[in-house]
Amino acid sequence: MSFLSNIFARRQQSSSVAKDRLQILLAHERGAGEAGESDLIRQLHKEIMEVIARHVAVDQDKVQIKVDRGSGCSMLEIDVEVPQELSGKRGS
């Protein structure tokens, strides 16, 4: 029965899935220290660029990703410079 429910189950929205993945990734890397942080930043940058590229053409050098670790929480900061004329791939 679980096979059929997997096929016909309602899929989560991509934003919800992305948020869950980031939370898991940040929680996992929280204790990794500085060496793990650079790997985390590279992986996040790659995945975020893939998602952005689906919707709009953005220069990879114009995307800045930073993780700030505080007491009890981490903050992921993403700065994306989007061109004024959106050359999106969705045709909107």
UniProtKB/Swiss-Prot annotation:
User: A Pfam family name for this chain?
Assistant: MinE
Keywords for this protein: Cell cycle, Cell division
* Known function: Prevents the cell division inhibition by proteins MinC and MinD at internal division sites while permitting inhibition at polar sites. This ensures cell division at the proper site by restricting the formation of a division septum at the midpoint of the long axis of the cell.
- Which species is listed as the source? Gluconobacter oxydans (strain 621H)
Query: Would the keyword Cell cycle turn up in this protein's UniProt record?
Result: yes
Superkingdom of source: Bacteria
Q: Which family does it belong to?
A: Belongs to the MinE family.
Designated name of the protein? Cell division topological specificity factor
GO biological process terms, alphabetically, are:
cell division; regulation of division septum assembly
